[in-house]
Design a protein with these regions (language model features):
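Catalytic cores of nucleic-acid endonucleases
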Residues: 62-104, 109
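A structural signal for short, well-ordered beta-strand segments and their strand-loop junctions
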Residues: 38-39, 106
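Short acidic/glycine-enriched loop/turn segments that link adjacent beta-strands
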Residues: 42-45
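Conserved catalytic cores of phosphodiester-cleaving nucleases, focusing on short active-site segments
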Residues: 29, 48-50, 55-65
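Acidic-basic catalytic patches of nuclease active cores, encompassing PD-(D/E)XK
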Residues: 2-37
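Non-catalytic C-terminal interaction segments of nucleic acid-processing enzymes
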Residues: 101, 105-152
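Conserved functional hotspots at enzyme active or ligand-binding sites that engage polyanionic ligands
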Residues: 28-30, 57, 73-88, 123, ...
Length: 152
């Protein structure tokens, strides 16, 4: 089998980055005293599931990067050949890991842009408030508390 070196290296680094993000989100959810289920195999449309005992949440894990004072992540999937696909109906929340600041955020899929989502780390220069998502509002610890009960 012939493998192009450049594509192979890119694919491996993408897989490793995704694995690191999944491990970080899993760790953060467990530290927040939540029960976390890990689906078996790669055929599942989500990466993790949180079970509170009262409801379940399908979690799609994303690795973010910081650009222009914002935590930025792709809020769509690519199904190689079919283009961009929304996660609506396939996941309930994004578990977003930012390796640059080593933090995890939980962002609802509903209401997220269908291509790229940005969470601001700092206030806007023009003091705009409408439509601005601040990263601090999506901390994993706050989301866990908002569920009403931790599954400890």
């Amino acid at each position: 089998m012939f493998v192009r070196a450049g594509r192979y290296v890119h694919r491996v680094s993408t897989i490793l980055r995704g694995n690191a993000a999944e491990a970080a989100v899993l760790n953060a959810l467990i530290r927040a005293d939540l029960f976390v289920l890990v689906p078996f195999g790669d055929g599942c449309p989500y990466d993790l599931m949180v079970d509170t005992g009262l409801e379940t949440f399908k979690v799609q894990v994303k690795c973010a990067r910081i650009r222009d004072h914002c935590i930025t992540f792709n809020s769509c999937g690519t199904d190689h050949g079919r283009g961009r696909e929304s996660y609506e109906g396939r996941a309930d929340v994004f578990g977003v890991y930012s390796p640059q600041i080593d933090r995890v955020f939980i962002v609802p899929v509903d209401g997220s842009p269908h291509f790229q989502t940005r969470l601001r780390c700092t206030p806007t220069r023009n003091n705009q408030q409408r439509g601005v998502r601040y990263a601090g509002d999506y901390a994993v610890e706050d989301w866990a508390r908002s569920l009403g009960r931790a599954a400890a």
